[in-house]
Amino acid sequence: MRCVPVFIILLLLASPAASDPLEKRIQSDLIRAALEDADTKNDPRILEDIVSTALATCCKFQFLNFCCNEK
């Protein structure tokens, strides 16, 4: 007799709730937007920008001797 309420509660927890149509549409829009963002390509010059910024910082604070050209 005690197992019946537990079984009903577990069944209710496991069953998917009826989703709101607006919520379902928002979720599908977010998934589509995420897939479109995943397809975008990075600018090939981004690596050059990162390296030049790192070298400028290295030269400014003189962390390493070999990163700057001695004049």
Swiss-Prot record:
GO terms for molecular function: toxin activity. Disulfide bonds: none annotated. This is Conotoxin Ca5.1. Pfam families: Chi-conotoxin. Keywords: Amidation, Disulfide bond, Secreted, Signal, Toxin. Residues 20-56 form a propeptide. Expressed by the venom duct. It is found in: Secreted. It comes from Conus caracteristicus (Characteristic cone). The cysteine framework is V (CC-CC). One of its GO terms (cellular component) is extracellular region. Residues 1-19 form the signal peptide. Contains 2 disulfide bonds that can be either 'C1-C3, C2-C4' or 'C1-C4, C2-C3', since these disulfide connectivities have been observed for conotoxins with cysteine framework V (for examples, see AC P0DQQ7 and AC P81755). Belongs to the conotoxin T superfamily.
